[in-house]
């Protein structure tokens, strides 16, 4: 272990006192994210730079002492990092999630069965609310369904913060955190890294990055757009607020309560999706607008952030009418009858949310990787490719799978004989990798259930 004593950064500056704000119980809520007004539409200014690291555990399966020691080390490492960098976009935000292999292979079955959240099926607790990822109707044959034990999502307005933290966590030897030498946060011996995925999420970034890399179709990306496909990604009304994606918050999705071990946890989906940029921009603005949202949209080309307020929600009857009348389905409209509440709803915490409120949270980010920066299990191409590392949070994997199947739109497409190009925008996407994870609360982010074995 380190010969360098842990630096008492709090003795220099106590970020907890410098920044007034309560640390969230969830990992997915992001302190310090401000909101801009885009033509009266609120848009969250999410962290600019992102990296995801996936890994398998290197400790021996069944070694309870080793797992408990790993939990203690990771807890201390994350706490040390957050003492050096503020828990804000201008510092660093870290989320840790766990794949099913972790719970199946490292946690005794009797313990996992006792504590794991279960989806409500026919009014009763059924299967675990985290499942293996599956293929959907329009997926390519080469799609990889991953089986990682753990994933780390790092985000910051400063790319150097992410790089420094990743080196300190995963590379042995002396490292620097905010100018301070350190070895006490190294936990790399606990993992075998399977992939490193990097990207960005900022207004105008897709066009700038695509132009600099010479990606075909770059000049057609609207200036100021957050997405390669145009438009804005982080509409406040299009992102679940507070703890709405947690297992326990909305009654009826899982058996979890505010007192459950996995309260303030959620199901996390991670995938990589490549984008056919030239094909997408062969469609005019009105066509792209309607395929992104719904066939009744009329906003002009200058509007990158059409309203996503609850009263704009498309429910199932309207979706079918779009298919019947307009012969076109919008991507957002395809899923909203599942990703939003269909009536005024009271959460387990007593909050009343209006009909049309979204309960699904996205934290996806753009990428030009093909498919990753590093991939232990497959090839990586140096040729840049526009895409997205998609991260989403839902109360259960079962709900996510229902939402994602609707994105393919197979039933309405067959019923109304719609061409692929009029069924959302799935035709222009190719998913290469996919996995579901459980993201626990901050209190249990380091090897959940290890203390129970």
Predicted regions, residues:
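Long, histidine/aromatic-enriched segments associated with O2/redox biology
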Residues: 3-453
């Amino acid at each position: 272990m380190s010969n360098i004593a842990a630096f008492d950064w709090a003795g220099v500056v106590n970020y907890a006192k410098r920044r007034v704000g309560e640390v969230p119980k969830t990992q997915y809520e992001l302190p310090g994210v401000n909101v801009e007004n885009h033509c009266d539409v609120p848009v969250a200014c999410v962290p600019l730079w992102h990296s995801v690291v996936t890994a398998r555990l290197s400790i021996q399966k069944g070694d309870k002492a080793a797992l408990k020691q790993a939990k203690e080390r990771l807890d201390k490492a994350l706490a040390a990092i957050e003492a050096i960098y503020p828990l804000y976009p201008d510092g660093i935000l870290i989320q840790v999630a766990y794949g099913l292999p972790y719970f199946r292979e490292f946690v005794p079955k009797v313990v996992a069965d006792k504590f794991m959240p279960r989806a409500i099926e026919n009014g009763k607790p059924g299967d675990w609310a985290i499942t293996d990822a599956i293929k959907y109707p329009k997926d390519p044959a080469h799609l990889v369904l991953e089986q990682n034990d753990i994933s780390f999502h790092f985000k910051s307005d400063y790319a150097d913060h992410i790089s420094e933290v990743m080196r300190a966590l995963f590379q042995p030897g002396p490292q620097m955190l905010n100018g301070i030498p350190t070895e006490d946060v190294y936990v790399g011996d606990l993992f075998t890294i399977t992939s490193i995925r990097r990207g960005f999420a900022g207004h105008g970034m897709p066009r700038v990055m695509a132009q600099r890399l010479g990606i075909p179709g770059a000049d057609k990306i609207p200036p100021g757009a957050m997405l390669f496909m145009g438009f804005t990604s982080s509409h406040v009304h299009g992102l679940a607020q507070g703890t709405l994606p947690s297992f326990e918050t909305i009654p009826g999705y899982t058996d979890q309560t505010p007192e459950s071990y996995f309260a303030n946890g959620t199901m996390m989906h991670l995938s990589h999706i490549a984008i056919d940029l030239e094909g997408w921009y062969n469609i005019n603005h009105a066509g792209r607008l309607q395929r992104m949202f719904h066939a009744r949209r009329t906003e002009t080309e200058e509007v990158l952030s059409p309203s996503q307020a609850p009263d704009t929600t498309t429910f199932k009857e309207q979706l079918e009418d779009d298919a019947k009348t307009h012969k076109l389905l919008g991507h957002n409209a395809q899923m909203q009858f599942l990703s939003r509440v269909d009536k005024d709803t009271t959460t387990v915490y007593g909050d009343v949310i209006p009909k049309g409120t979204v309960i699904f949270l996205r934290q996806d980010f753009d990428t030009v990787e093909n498919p990753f920066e590093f991939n232990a299990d497959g090839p990586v191409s140096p040729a840049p490719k526009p895409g997205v590392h998609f991260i989403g949070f839902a109360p259960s994997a079962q709900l996510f799978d229902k939402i994602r199947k609707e994105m393919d739109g197979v039933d309405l497409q067959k019923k109304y004989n719609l061409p692929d190009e009029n069924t959302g925008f799935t035709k222009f996407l190719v998913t290469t990798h996919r996995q579901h994870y459980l993201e626990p609360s901050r209190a249990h982010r380091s090897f959940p259930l290890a203390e129970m074995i």
